[in-house]
A protein has these predicted regions:
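Composition- and surface-driven signal marking solvent-exposed, interaction-prone regions
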Residues: 76-78, 131, 141-146, 231-232, ...
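Non-catalytic, conformational "gating/processing" segments within enzyme and secreted inhibitor domains
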Residues: 1-134, 156-239
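Internal alpha/beta scaffold segment
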Residues: 133-159
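Extended hydrophobic
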Residues: 63, 115-131, 240-274
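Short, charged/polar low-complexity linear motifs in solvent-exposed/disordered segments
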Residues: 82, 145-146, 244
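Extracytoplasmic/secreted cell-surface and envelope-processing proteins
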Residues: 138-140, 174-176, 227, 264-267
């Protein structure tokens, strides 16, 4: 907020460690929210256009992180092979979807929880890992086995196999308030106007009054476009065999977009209904 004093040391650390931009803004101006929304739109190639609808009177600053990813499949799906097929939603209903189709060699593994296929992008620096639950389990039952140790083990088990992959086109636009999740994970004081301690940031009595993430993921024959914006608001008191293996994604599944050299996860989600 224009005129609100933040310690230079806090600004310097954010510029140095996160290449953060710092901008003063008149929060009382009716166009202030438009400035913030425009920045988010520019950073996400217009995938996410509105993250702020109004600025409360007690808001003092917004800490906003934006992530944009566009990956072209190393082996693209041919649009001529896309057919209308059924996808069974988690509630048992069936929905006609545009089902993409290709037969190619991909990394593959199978265990008691999932059949797993890894579809690389471009030069293979990034990939999408598809997790299709075992036929005798629901997606949530299989996801209960997704621990850090199992994730590492499953990735190590991946090896090249010829797969016939059927994958629906899908687009996800989703936003979620994160405060309850952070509190459940043990981060409580930061959201309490009487207990929060941001004294290394400012002399004002600050607390986090807003923590919200906006996500956009679009998967089609060409590849994947994905973006995420996390908004934190600081308020003042008064986060192969010869026969191809069938990998048909025709029921609820999970996906992970990762950077391969480090294993860093950029996006992850689950699709339960199309």
């Amino acid at each position: 907020k224009e005129g609100f004093k933040v310690y230079d040391s806090f600004v310097d650390v954010n510029k140095k460690m996160y290449d953060a931009q710092v901008q003063e803004l008149d929060f009382a101006s009716p166009t202030a929210k438009d400035v913030i929304n425009q920045w988010c739109a520019e950073q996400t190639n217009n995938c996410i256009k509105e993250v702020i609808q109004r600025i409360p009177e007690d808001a003092r600053m917004y800490l906003i992180n934006a992530l944009y990813f566009k990956g072209i499949w190393k082996s693209q799906f041919q649009k001529s092979d896309t057919r209308q097929e059924n996808f069974t939603n988690s509630d048992g209903t069936e929905q006609k979807v545009n089902m993409m189709n290709q037969t190619e060699t991909f990394n593959y593994a199978q265990n008691s929880a999932f059949s797993i296929a890894e579809l690389p992008y471009g030069n293979e620096a990034f990939s999408m890992v598809l997790l299709l639950p075992a036929v005798d389990k629901t997606l949530d039952e299989s996801l209960s086995e997704l621990t850090y140790e199992n994730w590492k083990e499953w990735n190590t088990a991946l090896s090249g196999r010829q797969l016939q992959v059927k994958l629906p086109r899908f687009k996800v636009e989703y936003n979620k308030m994160l405060i309850e999740d952070m509190v459940a994970m043990g981060m409580k004081d930061a959201f309490d106007g009487y207990k929060a301690d941001f004294s290394k940031m400012s002399a004002a009595e600050l607390y986090i009054g807003l923590l919200q993430q906006f996500t956009y993921v679009n998967v089609d024959e060409e590849g994947t476009e994905a973006a995420a914006v996390t908004v934190g608001g600081m308020f003042e008191t008064s986060v192969g065999p010869s026969t191809p293996i069938s990998f048909y994604v025709d029921r609820p599944f999970a996906f992970v977009i990762k950077e391969k050299s480090t294993g860093a996860i950029l996006f992850m989600g689950k699709i339960t209904k199309l």
